[in-house]
């Protein structure tokens, strides 16, 4: 291999973006097939493809960044910019849902009874499960910051403990949200209230699941001594977790508290 006289990472050709795209197509098509025809074949195939893609893509990135040293300071700087742009795109993604909610709730039409929540909808009590969920997510924000500071100070044991606690809080939040959905007195088919509620909180819940998965990989890497006090970009991408926290606060204030 020729000597590389610059600090930038020339990425090798990779099949994982393509297999990831195929998995995404299978998942979305599979969901439609499952909803309308009760068949889970495509959905299962999509899930298997997605899991295999994620495992092998993570393996490649860990090898390049940790063992081959390709993630030099300029490369890490580029990755940070990429993460900031990704989170910015996610902000606009959620702005769309808030826009739909406020557009419907600030000027409810006569079909909704000219009131909000619409006639016939019994909203959830914001001071029960939603308030507990808020406390759980805020606590997870504290523990993930604790984990970050532990890694920066080289305190391996505390980093593992706090990261484990963060993941458990994320899973607890997901379980509470699933229970809330199961017991909700309205469904996604109940007009604009049901659709905006379930789409906004559902996509947020999906982000919590993805974040928990990424933090689990960070935990495994921390256990295997991959992170140092100076080189731990994989964990710094936990900015995503703080973003999920902030989105939930807006959801809680807008949809659960004000919207009820």
Swiss-Prot record:
Catalysed reactions, semicolon-separated: 4 Fe(II)-[cytochrome c] + O2 + 8 H(+)(in) = 4 Fe(III)-[cytochrome c] + 2 H2O + 4 H(+)(out)
Residue ranges annotated as Mitochondrial intermembrane topological domain: 35-40, 106-128, 184-190, 256-260
Mitochondrial matrix side: 1-15, 67-72, 153-155, 224-232
Keywords: Membrane, Mitochondrion, Mitochondrion inner membrane, Translocase, Transmembrane, Transmembrane helix
Transmembrane segments: 16-34, 41-66, 73-105, 129-152, 156-183, 191-223, 233-255
Membrane topology classification: Multi-pass membrane protein
Main location per the UniProt record: mitochondrion
GO biological-process terms attached to the record: mitochondrial electron transport, cytochrome c to oxygen
Name of the top EC class for this enzyme: translocase
GO annotation, cellular component aspect: mitochondrial inner membrane; mitochondrion; respiratory chain complex IV
E.C. number: 7.1.1.9
GO MF entries: cytochrome-c oxidase activity
Stated role: Component of the cytochrome c oxidase, the last enzyme in the mitochondrial electron transport chain which drives oxidative phosphorylation. The respiratory chain contains 3 multisubunit complexes succinate dehydrogenase (complex II, CII), ubiquinol-cytochrome c oxidoreductase (cytochrome b-c1 complex, complex III, CIII) and cytochrome c oxidase (complex IV, CIV), that cooperate to transfer electrons derived from NADH and succinate to molecular oxygen, creating an electrochemical gradient over the inner membrane that drives transmembrane transport and the ATP synthase.
Subunit details: Component of the cytochrome c oxidase (complex IV, CIV), a multisubunit enzyme composed of 14 subunits. The complex is composed of a catalytic core of 3 subunits MT-CO1, MT-CO2 and MT-CO3, encoded in the mitochondrial DNA, and 11 supernumerary subunits COX4I, COX5A, COX5B, COX6A, COX6B, COX6C, COX7A, COX7B, COX7C, COX8 and NDUFA4, which are encoded in the nuclear genome.
Family label: Belongs to the cytochrome c oxidase subunit 3 family.
The name this protein goes by in its record: Cytochrome c oxidase subunit 3
Organism of this sequence: Xenopus laevis (African clawed frog)
Gene label: mt-co3
């Amino acid at each position: 291999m020729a000597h590389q006289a610059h600090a930038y990472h020339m990425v090798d050709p990779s099949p994982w973006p393509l297999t990831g795209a195929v998995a995404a197509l299978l998942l979305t098509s599979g969901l439609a097939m499952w909803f309308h025809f009760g068949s889970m074949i495509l959905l299962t195939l999509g899930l298997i493809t997605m899991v295999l893609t994620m495992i092998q893509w993570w393996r490649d990135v860990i090898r390049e960044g940790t063992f081959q040293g390709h993630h030099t300071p300029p490369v890490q700087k580029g990755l940070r910019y990429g993460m900031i742009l990704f989170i910015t795109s996610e902000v606009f993604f959620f702005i769309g849902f808030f826009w739909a909610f406020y557009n419907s709730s600030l000027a409810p039409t006569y079909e909704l009874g000219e009131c909000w929540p619409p006639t016939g909808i019994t909203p959830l009590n914001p001071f029960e499960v939603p308030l507990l969920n808020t406390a759980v997510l805020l606590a997870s924000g504290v523990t993930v910051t604790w984990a970050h500071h532990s890694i920066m100070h080289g305190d391996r044991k505390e980093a593992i403990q706090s990261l484990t606690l963060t993941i458990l809080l994320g899973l607890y939040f997901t379980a509470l949200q699933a229970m809330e959905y199961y017991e909700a007195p309205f469904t996604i088919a109940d007009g604009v209230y049901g659709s905006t509620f379930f789409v906004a909180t559902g996509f947020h819940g999906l982000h919590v699941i993805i974040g928990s998965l990424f933090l689990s990989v960070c935990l495994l890497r921390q256990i295997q001594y991959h992170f140092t006090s100076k080189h731990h970009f994989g964990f710094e991408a936990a900015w995503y977790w703080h973003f999920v926290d902030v989105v939930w606060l807006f959801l809680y204030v807008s949809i659960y508290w004000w919207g009820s």
